[in-house]
Amino acid sequence: MVRVAHFYAYSHVQEVRKLNRGTAVSFAPTVSFRNAERIYLGSGTHIGEGSVIWAGNSTSRVILGEKCLLAPNVTITASNYGIVEGTPVMDQPKIEKDIVIGPGVWLGANVVVTAGVTIGAGAIVGAGAVVTRDLPANCIAGGVPARVIGHRPAAPGEQAPTVPAAAFDRAVAP
């Protein structure tokens, strides 16, 4: 019980107060946030159970556009350890890079998004994928590492879906 209370207070309650978020943002009580003052959640975004969203310790941000959908157990981390030989990984400086996720993106269960990645508006990333490089708007991606495997189809008689750039610009503005 003590461990649960510690997790909840350290990774959720204290950090939620620091979040930058739009209206109608929802997330499960088991979501873990770190360095939340550098996390930006666009209006209408939902984050599923067990997800982890960590901005960097000093500079890097995590920015989610409006109406993003994160399934359970998504991990987004905007920093990573260095890997220089001869120094234990724990002793190496962290490498921090912003993560920008456009509006209307859907990340399936157990997706991992690594530091420095931009995911374009309306993209869909399949369950279990590891996103290590940028993905274009309206793509469907999957795999380890994630790669584009298709594009979202247009509704009958319509053009492919797009999300207005203004919605993304609002999410990116600090």
Protein language model annotation of sequence segments:
Residues 25-26, 57, 118-120, 135:
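Extended beta-solenoid/beta-helix repeat architectures
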Residues 1-17, 22-23, 67, 80-84, ...:
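Terminal amphipathic alpha-helical/low-complexity segments used for targeting or macromolecular assembly
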Residues 109-124, 129-133:
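Beta-rich strand-turn-strand
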Residues 9, 32-41, 46-117, 144, ...:
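Flexible, glycine/small-residue-enriched loop-and-beta-strand segment within the central core
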Residues 60, 137-139, 147:
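Glycine-centered loop/turn positions within well-structured domains
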